[in-house]
Amino acid sequence: SKMRLTQPLKRIGKRGDNNFEPISWDQALDEIAQKMRTIKKTNGSEALGLFSGTRTGTLTNRGYIRMFSKLWGTPNFVTTEPFCSSGKNLAYSMTQGYSGPGNSYTESDMGSAALHVYWGDNQAETRPVHFGMINDWRLKKGSRMIVIDPRKTVTASKADWHIPIRPGGDMALALAVIHYIFEKNLHDEMFCKAWVLGWEKWKSFILKKGYTPAWAAKFADISVDQICRLAEEIAHADGCIIYGSRGINQHMNSTQSNRVLMFLAAITGNWGRPGGAYFNMSASLPIDLQIPEDKLADIKKPKLR
């Protein structure tokens, strides 16, 4: 692309004039380092704030930049996690004791699913490389694809069935699907008895609360017949992967919505098997690079809030 930068540019003139001149990497790094040292000497190490996004890469985002903040001595390091994935991280930890999904980006795993359900996840536009790979596997196997999204997204245009849910109705819909599956005894009882702790109490709770398709229809703006059909497809699929992402993570009840979808995957036996999972695409690896104690900076002030 003609717009791609291939070397550092330094502003000349006033800010906003949009005038820049190319400089070498050595000059750029030297000038930045000198300004950082000046700020640290004048205002303290806490004057430096670091913000890192996911596009820097997991190892850089959660590893090197976090490590640099500890070596520099600033507590003011933040990523996109609080508004991108904190809800699902907590949900994964509460449900399975680990903050990441339990399946892999492989054809033998994700390509084995008979049903792919994209729940608030527009992968075709937001993660085209991932989607292209997974969708190629899906088409190769001849698997079905359902998209649950208020908008007719690019991902939805590829689906066998698009369910235009009302924004915020995700947890109600998932609870109703679970209610139907339990009521019709469509759950994988053998899997539940072997691997799902507390599933009988969960079943009793769901049925007692009355989270029926009729109850959820008014919250999700989806017909009872559609809710029942969705439950049937998930329960009868020989391997179903439910993909969640920003549509779940950045809305109300994020943590509990993620947990309910994890429960849905669990009671249908879609956990820890090829082609079966709840896979939140905001997932990241837990990385904690260790730093020798004598190299850690002394952080004197608390993190800014």
Language model: regions and residue ranges:
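Short glycine/proline- and acidic residue-enriched helix-loop micro-motifs
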Residues: I12-F20, K201, T212-A217
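Non-catalytic, charge-rich alpha-helical accessory subdomains
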Residues: A217, I222-I242
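N-terminal export/assembly segments and adjacent metallocofactor-ligating motifs
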Residues: S1-K184, S223
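Internal, active-site/partner-interface "lid" segment
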Residues: N185-P213
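Flexible, glycine/charged-enriched surface loops at secondary-structure junctions
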Residues: N43-A47, H187-C192, I241, G272-F279
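Conserved short loop/turn motifs at secondary-structure junctions
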Residues: G49-G57, K218-I222, S245-M252, S284
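A glycine-rich, hydrophobic/aromatic-adjacent loop/helix-cap motif
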Residues: I234-R305
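Conserved active-site and cofactor/substrate-binding residues in soluble primary-metabolism enzymes
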Residues: I23, Q27, G63, G168, ...
